[in-house]
């Protein structure tokens, strides 16, 4: 039951390598957008969900089911975060949103961390998952057998990649890379007092100016297989 966390600077390939590695390993892949989409799906009635055998659910449906269970447990425990709408808002928070210090934040730091930690730990405990970002390398750092991967690339290359991928001007891509790097670093310093690019937090560091995303995915999958044996 492999568990991989992917962390990386924007446009360094963490998302692409994570998805490709999940495909090679036959595991699920989850990132912020998939979590938000799953929370949005919680409006689907239980009757509709009950008509399906859980083994036939798509990963998105299973993720929604997991989040529904999380909300039910939170409500039973008197947790202040209740309802799919509140969860969707929380999961949609960016690094920049949570790194800011506000006197009266819409979502408190403690609620955010408690919720994200619980969700990511449950994903890790279930296994067969590649998780992108959200501090997953910190939350699952003590999970036996989990593989933590960092992707890096020179800023100039990341700007070039982002401009091409998003169809934006180089100046706009430059600002976005700068803002993303700053927010990602501030987020990890705020919640874990950690340098997000500290290589000691990771088992593998991939410098993607020197290798393709496909090779990076093969290296990640190979490392997982060497730890858990053939599937």
Which residues fall in each region the model found?
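Glycine-rich phosphate-binding P-loop
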Residues: 5-19
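C-terminal helical "lid" subdomain and adjoining coupling/linker elements of P-loop NTPases
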Residues: 227-231
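Short beta-strand-centered segment that lines the nucleotide-binding/catalytic pocket of NTP-utilizing
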Residues: 28-39
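Conserved phosphate-donor/acceptor-positioning beta-strand/loop module used by diverse small-molecule
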Residues: 142-179
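ATP-dependent small-molecule kinase phosphotransfer cores
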Residues: 39-128
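Pre-Walker A (Motif I) flank of P-loop NTPase domains
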Residues: 1-4, 127
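Small-molecule kinase domains that catalyze NTP-dependent phosphoryl transfer to phosphate-bearing small molecules
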Residues: 59-66, 79-80, 169-214
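Short, amphipathic alpha-helical "lid/cap" segments that border enzyme active or binding sites
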Residues: 117, 213-217, 221
């Amino acid at each position: 039951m492999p568990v991989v966390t992917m962390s990386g600077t924007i446009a360094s390939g963490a998302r692409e390598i994570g998805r490709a590695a999940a495909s090679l390993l036959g595991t699920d892949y989850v990132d912020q957008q998939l979590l938000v989409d799953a929370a949005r799906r919680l409006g689907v009635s239980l009757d509709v969900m009950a008509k399906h055998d859980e083994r036939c659910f798509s990963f998105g449906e299973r993720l929604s089911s997991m989040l529904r269970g999380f909300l039910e447990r939170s409500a039973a425990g008197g947790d202040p975060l209740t309802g799919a709408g509140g969860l969707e808002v929380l999961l949609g928070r960016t690094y920049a949103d949570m790194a800011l210090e506000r006197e009266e934040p819409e979502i408190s730091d403690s609620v955010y961390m408690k919720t994200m930690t619980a969700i990511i730990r449950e994903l890790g405990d279930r296994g067969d998952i590649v998780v992108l970002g959200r501090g997953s390398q910190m939350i699952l750092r003590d999970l036996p057998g989990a593989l933590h991967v960092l992707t890096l690339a020179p800023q100039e290359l990341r700007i070039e990649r982002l401009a091409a991928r998003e169809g934006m001007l180089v100046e706009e891509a430059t600002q976005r890379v700068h803002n993303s790097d700053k927010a990602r670093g501030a987020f990890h310093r705020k919640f874990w007092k950690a340098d997000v690019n500290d290589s000691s937090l990771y088992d593998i560091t991939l410098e993607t100016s020197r290798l393709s995303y496909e090779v990076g995915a093969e290296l990640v999958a190979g490392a997982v297989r060497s730890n858990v044996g053939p599937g």
